Curated annotation (Swiss-Prot):
It comes from Actinidia deliciosa (Kiwi). It is an enzyme of class 3 (hydrolase). Belongs to the pectinesterase family. Pfam families: Pectinesterase. Glycans are attached at N75, N275, N290, N319. The active site is at D137 (proton donor), D158 (nucleophile). SUPFAM superfamilies: Pectin lyase-like. This is Pectinesterase. It comes from the Eukaryota. Inhibited by PMEI. Disulfide bonds join C151-C171. Keywords: Acetylation, Aspartyl esterase, Cell wall biogenesis/degradation, Disulfide bond, Glycoprotein, Hydrolase. InterPro entries: Pectin_lyas_fold, Pectin_lyase_fold/virulence, Pectinesterase_Asp_AS, Pectinesterase_cat.
Length: 321
């Protein structure tokens, strides 16, 4: 469905031409525990506010004017006294949340440690053509089932992290220029029990350097992930990896912590960063060409996409391709 075909329930505009001038006011106006979709159209502009879609605010949809046009921005960080969890510019818990055409940013900067742009703990949440801009801990895929399609994610350290069941499909993941003596790590998945059906699935994505990193690529090492928790689970499937990825591919968290219990897989990736000949030799890591091993990480199997995503009117494929 084209954005123009979706009729919003309320409009947010900085210039007063809508129903509200802040996103937060529009969220507050949504009926609690709604089974019907409530659409908030957020007109182009930069909204400097912290937005909380709590568990009572179900089936909300944010529609913006596109990446780089509609911005929600904040700068909370751990250095400035917030917890990682509370540092998020936008936090979503209400089930059935959809965002489309919005840039979420935490502009605290690379010296402020953890500073989250968006945290999702919303089951059945989906993000289409959105961007997530930060440095350390940009995108907190906190918990439950979530889907990201045609999104751009920018960061430095552990910038896609958490313990959701998350699939990123056809997204662009960009490592930025960190501080001196810092490394870039795309993921830090937080599964702490082998029975949890959680993980980060990177499917048919581009793994690349952001514009500010390109001229200084040789000064910084960049890795696909590191194990935040003991049973960390992350897969890169059919993705295109630029040359920024260190030949080892993956980084330890602390000594040999989790190296036997983690589950990291690479499957049929392409590009100069996908060369696996010098990869780590941890017991929990493997390169696989076995489709039956990775089929569990598709939208259909990993997050049961056929039960909910197909009604969201956003492009999705349930299988590997």
């Amino acid at each position: 469905t084209a954005v123009t075909d979706i009729v919003p329930d309320v409009v947010v505009a900085k210039d007063g031409s809508g129903n509200f001038t802040t996103v937060g006011a529009a969220v507050a106006a949504a009926k609690d525990s709604s089974t019907a979709r409530f659409v908030i159209y957020i007109k182009e502009g930069a909204y400097f506010e912290y937005v909380d879609v709590d568990k009572k605010k179900t089936n909300l949809m944010f529609i913006g004017d596109g990446i780089g046009k509609t911005w929600i921005k904040g700068n909370r960080s751990v250095v400035d006294g917030w917890t990682t969890f509370r540092s998020s510019t936008v936090a979503v818990v209400g089930t059935g949340f959809i965002a489309r055409g919005i840039s979420f940013e935490n502009y605290a900067g690379p010296s402020k440690h953890q500073a989250v742009a968006l945290r999702s703990g919303a089951d059945f949440s989906a993000f289409y053509q959105c961007s997530f801009v930060g440095y350390q801990d940009t995108l907190y895929v906190h918990s439950l089932r979530q889907f990201y399609s045609e999104c751009d994610v920018y960061g430095t350290i552990d910038f896609i992290f958490g313990n959701a069941a998350a699939v990123l499909q056809k997204c662009n993941l960009y490592a930025r220029k960190p501080n001196e003596n810092q490394k870039n790590i795309f993921t830090a998945q937080g599964r702490d029990d082998p029975n949890q059906n959680t993980g980060i699935s990177i499917l048919n994505c581009k793994v690349a350097a952001a514009a500010d990193l390109i001229p200084v690529l040789s000064s910084f090492k960049t890795y696909l992930g590191r194990p935040w928790k003991e049973y960390s689970r992350t897969v890169f499937l059919l993705s295109q990896m630029e040359s920024l990825i260190d030949p080892a591919g993956w980084l330890e968290w602390s000594g040999d912590f989790a190296l036997t219990t983690l589950y990291y897989r690479e499957y049929k990736n392409t590009g100069p960063g996908s060369n696996t000949t010098a990869r780590v030799t941890w017991p929990g890591y493997a390169v696989t060409t076995n489709e039956t091993e990775v089929i569990q990480f598709t939208v259909g199997n990993f997050i049961q996409g056929s039960q909910w995503l197909t009604s969201y009117n956003i492009p999705v494929y349930l299988n590997l391709t």
